Structures are given as structure tokens and as C-alpha cells.
Amino acid sequence: RNKNKLILLSLWHFFTNFAVQYETGMQGILACDKLDKMNKPKAVFREINESYTLQEAIAEAKRCLNCKNPSCKKGCPIENHIPEFIHELSKGNMGNAMAIINEKSNLPAICGRVCPHEKQCQGHCVLYPKGKGIEIGKLERFVADFDTEMKLIREKLPQKTRGKVAVIGSGPAGLTVAGDLARQGFNVTIFESQAEPGGVLMYGIPEYRLPKQVVRQEIEKIEALGVTFLLNCVVGKQLNIDDIFAQG
């Protein structure tokens, strides 16, 4: 019995000392980690998919067969004018390519990065079964990024004569409908509960997949159409439907 007690006491002392040392050590690690974070800049994750150069984009665009009945267009949920913008890109007409994309898409720099192209436009390309499908998403992304950098397209603000529209939420659906309505002459206000617009684009997709700066740049283009954003505004708590109507 005495021997067993001695063993138990030894084990108790061992684990007690271990726990104290572990807690002390962890406190030291956490303190060092906190100090390290204060002194070092935050890590920035690069995109996993690199963009084309101008020469690469034009070369890829020239592979398009410009089909008479483009199946790629049928595979696109918004029926983007894919062969048309690729044709303009193949000739180096970036402004024309961007104007064609804008006819259907309000968020091309985002769609060019996160859309499941293999299941949609690119997956319907006649060259896809042979493993040589046109990289439609990367081409769309290239044109959109080129436009952002070079400021090729700056649309005229249409006169807001068709009334007011409230959009609840500034996720991809809210941004898209706001852009479409603004182009048609409606005065659009987006009510967003978060401190920054974007919804799932801003808060739900990791930086290496969709950089926050890209989302912000696309939102700036929507805002440039005359769309107003009301942030930190929770509809249903801070405002109800009657309050919105009371604002006109």
C-alpha cells in the first residue's frame, strides 16, 4: 500500500509540475506570438490562379473557333456574349471587349475568378472534350482587370427618372440587380448590415481565391453608376418596410 501511495504521489507531482510548466510556457508563447504579430505585417495570400499577360490573352482568344451556334453562350447562366468579346480581345480591342461584357455582367472581374467555368461556359466549349477548351473565365478576368487598371470604360450616368428602388443586401445578387436598375435610370439604394459591402464576396471567400481589393474595385464601378450604399443598417431591426417607404 505504501508503495502504491508513493507511486500515486510521484505521478501527482509529475503532472502538477507539468501542468504548471505547460501553462507558464503557453503564456510565454502567447506573449511572444502577440509581440510578434505587433511587429510583423499581416500575411498576404497571393491568388492561386495567375492572370494572363496581354500576349497570352490575345493568343488564347485567337484559338476561339467563333462557332456559328456557340454552345459556350448556352452554358452561361446570364448568356454572356462570349464569342463576341473574345473576338474583340483577339484583335486587341480591349475597350470593345469590355463594353460587350458590360452588356450582361456587372461583376466580370469576380465572375472570371470564382464561377465554375468547367461546368458552365468553358465546359460547353466544343474544344473542351479534347482537353483544349478556351479559358473563358481567365479571358473575362483579364479584360476586367485590364479595364480597372487602364480605366477604359467609364459609363455615362443615366438620368434617374424612373423612380427609386431599395435593394436589401449587397451580395452578388444585390450588386447585380442594383447595377442593372441604375443603368435603366432607377435611383437605387442598397441597405447593407455589414460595415463594408460585398456580402459573401467580401466575407465568405478566402483572399487567395478572390482578393478583397478586386471586390472593392467592382463595387466602386457599381457605385459610379449612381448607386447609394447605406452600411451598418439592419433591415428588420433598425428599419422596417414602412421606414423605407417613408424615405421616399
Task: Label the predicted regions.
Residues 27-50, 79-91, 100-102, 129, ...:
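Beta1-alpha1 glycine-rich phosphate/pyrophosphate-binding loop at the start
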Residues 6, 19-22:
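Ser/Thr/Pro/Gly-rich low-complexity, intrinsically disordered segments
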Residues 61, 241-242:
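Short hydrophobic/charged patches on amphipathic alpha-helices used for structural packing
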Residues 2-4, 13:
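Intrinsic-disorder-associated, low-complexity terminal segments enriched in Asp/Asn/His/Tyr and depleted
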Residues 22-164:
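Ferredoxin-type iron-sulfur electron-transfer modules and their immediate structural context
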Residues 17-19, 207:
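Short, composition-biased linear "edge" segments at structural boundaries
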Residues 10, 16-17, 34, 38:
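Short, positively charged and aromatic/hydrophobic N-terminal segments
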